[in-house]
Amino acid sequence: METDLSRDLVKPTDSILRNDCERFDFKDPQMNPDELSHILAQTMMKNNGLCLAAPQIGLPYRVFAVLSNPILCMFNPIIVDTTSEEIYLEEMSLTYPGIVVKVKRPTIIRIRFTQPDEKTRTEKYIGMTSRYIQQGMDSIDGITLKDVTTSYHWEQGVKKRKKNG
């Protein structure tokens, strides 16, 4: 049986969500990268999430986990290219449970990131995985779901959550 490493999510008002996170330093790590990956993955799964960034659990690192098979943990990611085509789709965030809003994002991205084993990869992602990764990037850049949608869509999402309880 695997040990539960999951953590509590920070509140939407926590200032860490507004900070540009620091690079994860593999040469002098503040915590083991494999352990951090497991913490993020377990917390994401426990909360039925699709993406979870370190600041959402109170850690100031440029790291996030994305639901995939297997789960991807991206350290110090950089989006190196995006398609010019952008579409609106509904998104949610573990930071704002129950709020669903429309967000316009590129459909295809190329991203360079480091894995927990310190290997660097550059990969292309499309569709929903691309969108989850862009959400993770926002989170480590101090940008929340509320920041990437229009005020109209935000208000509609809040109203719908209240209506649905």
Where are these regions (language model features)?
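Positively charged
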Residues: 1-165
